[in-house]
Amino acid sequence: MEKVTGIGGLFFRAEDPAKLASWYEQHLGVTQVPTDYDQSPWIQQTGPTVFAPFEQETDYFGDPSKQWMINFRVDDLDRMVAQLRRHGIEVSVDETHYPNGRFARLRDPEGNPIELWEAAK
């Protein structure tokens, strides 16, 4: 069976796409969409990606009106959280150390939920 080889993009609606793209670049290092074919898109590091549809009634994303949540892998959760907090971004750290790693939550300027994941080493 032929399979997909990975996620090639994440596309979503935004009230102010340019402003939101700048926020992701400034605070999380996700480069913006190239404006021509000579530029490279954001290249993520090799690692696991979880593809998980959730029940409609889930509270995992926080706000029930949000239909998606993105999870970003990070090398050092504590350093990333400190960096975000220095910029005035509210981050909630789950103090539980799970077998698969540690997690933190925040929201982008438009209220979209973001999860940060430091995989277990």
Task: Give short role names for the model-derived ranges.
Residues T46-V50, E57-T58, D75-R79:
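Short, charged/polar surface micro-motifs in flexible loops or helix N-caps
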Residues P48-A52, G111-I114:
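Short, charged/polar, Gly/Pro-enriched secondary-structure boundary elements
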Residues S40-W42, W68, N100-A104:
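Short beta-strand micro-motifs in enzyme catalytic cores
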Residues D63-L84:
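Mid-chain, well-packed structural core segment of small domains
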Residues G6, G47-T49, K66-W68, R102:
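Residues that flank catalytic or metal-binding motifs in active/ligand-binding sites
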Residues T35, F54-E57, L116-K121:
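Acetyl-CoA-dependent GNAT
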Residues M1-G9, V81-K121:
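Vicinal oxygen chelate
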Residues E2-T5, F11-V50:
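Core segments of cupin and vicinal oxygen chelate
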